[in-house]
């Protein structure tokens, strides 16, 4: 989840990680904790053992990103019929791969893939923000997914406004133009200020409108809260901090409280508007390094969600604020600075004893990519991830980034996952 897409931005974050992690391996290629993990680390997946250890219900998801037309629609300006056809093709491929959940990005940049009274139609549909595409993409996606036995999770980006820094390029009626005091330019992009209570209230109204209209199975956030840090740049929220941050010892603590409030309030709003609808978040995979906090993972990541994105993802899991978490574990087994095996174990321990379901985010987009190391040239790498994760009973499934790679599967990595682990259909956990 183009750098502006969440997963490709995460790839940029990984380049920071690689540049700053340096030194000794975070956990080396950590000694396997079980026979199953040992086989996985040695490149010998044991799919039957993996399947046998799984619960009858299992998350098997795929993200379908719309920002910059990453996965769907393939380009802006297609006819409504062509867009529908591409959408249903993605759903049909999910069914063939025995997946059970599609996570569709429906509010990528303070816009909408449904007829919202709050925000304009997304430009990913027509090429022009605010132009009616002539159909209801979210309503259609929910109906067509359910007709195929798939869950449809609506994926929202709360605070990202635009992938450029020019407010005049937004529609004249855009809330960000009507309320310029809500907007913070940063890193060549426009963001809503999470420190303003009126902003937090507005983005929740905009998102909950979709929940009220459609029987989505879940609301989904990704890793974007405060923006990823950029050297030499400052996210200018000093005025908001002066007005609202007096009770906090630092601006960082105030920022974390702002995001905590969004998460708690959104969970309550979802339950109020459509009881039983779940709420999940997919954060960057490292909460904190152990060198920063002894409760953290044995990693040397260049990005830590607690410190850099002001997202206390561990707290949300431990305090059961969300129904599920999907940490983006976009590294291979044995990667020195952020070993998949170490992080899978850390998240499993974090979820232990909570009501928060743990699913692991998988970097299918790296499989066969020329710029990736040799581990990602092996079509068995992702299958090894699932085998290793099966040793942790807290792991209740996986989500793959993203739809384009599920469809194309350039080196057969997804086909190998399906053959090794998805021989039979499974329902998602509830």
Predicted stretch roles:
Residues 2, 7-30:
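N-terminal export signals
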């Amino acid at each position: 989840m183009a750098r502006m897409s969440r997963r490709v931005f995460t790839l940029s974050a990984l380049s920071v990680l690689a540049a700053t992690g340096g030194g000794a391996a975070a956990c080396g290629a950590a000694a396997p904790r079980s026979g199953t993990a040992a086989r996985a680390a040695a490149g010998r997946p044991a799919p039957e053992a993996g399947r046998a250890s799984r619960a009858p219900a299992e998350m098997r998801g795929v993200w379908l990103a719309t920002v910059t037309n990453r996965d769907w629609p393939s380009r802006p300006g297609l006819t409504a019929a062509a867009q529908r056809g591409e959408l249903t093709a993605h759903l049909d491929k999910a069914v063939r791969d025995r997946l059970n959940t599609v996570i569709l990005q429906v509010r990528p940049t303070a816009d909408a893939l449904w007829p919202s009274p709050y925000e304009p139609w997304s430009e990913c549909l027509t090429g022009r923000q605010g132009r009616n595409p002539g159909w209801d993409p979210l309503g259609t996606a929910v109906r067509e997914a359910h007709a195929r036995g798939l869950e449809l999770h609506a994926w929202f980006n709360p605070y990202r406004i635009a992938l450029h820094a020019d407010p005049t390029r937004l529609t004249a009626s855009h809330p960000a133009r009507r309320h310029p005091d809500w907007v913070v330019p940063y890193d060549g992009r426009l963001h809503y200020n999470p420190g303003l209570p009126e902003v937090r209230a507005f983005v929740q109204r905009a998102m909950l409108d979709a929940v009220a209209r459609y029987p989505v199975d879940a609301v989904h956030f990704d890793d974007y809260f405060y923006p990823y840090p950029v050297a030499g740049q400052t996210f200018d929220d000093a005025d908001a901090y002066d007005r609202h941050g007096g009770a906090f010892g630092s601006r960082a603590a105030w920022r974390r409280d702002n995001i905590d409030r969004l998460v708690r309030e959104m969970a309550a709003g979802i339950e109020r508007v459509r009881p039983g609808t779940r709420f999940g978040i997919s954060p960057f995979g490292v909460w904190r390094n152990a060198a920063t906090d002894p409760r953290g993972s044995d990693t040397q990541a260049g990005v830590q969600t607690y410190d850099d994105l002001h997202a206390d993802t561990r707290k949300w899991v431990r305090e059961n604020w969300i129904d599920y978490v999907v940490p983006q574990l976009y590294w291979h087994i044995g990667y020195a600075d952020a070993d998949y095996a170490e992080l899978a174990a850390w998240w499993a321990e974090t979820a232990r004893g909570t009501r928060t379901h743990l699913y692991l985010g998988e970097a299918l987009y790296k499989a066969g990519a020329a710029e990736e190391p040799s581990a990602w040239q092996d079509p068995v790498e992702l299958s090894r991830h699932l085998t290793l994760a099966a040793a942790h009973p807290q792991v209740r499934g996986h989500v793959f980034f993203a739809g384009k790679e599920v469809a194309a599967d350039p080196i057969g990595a997804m086909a190998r996952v399906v053959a090794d682990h998805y021989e039979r259909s499974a329902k998602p956990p509830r």
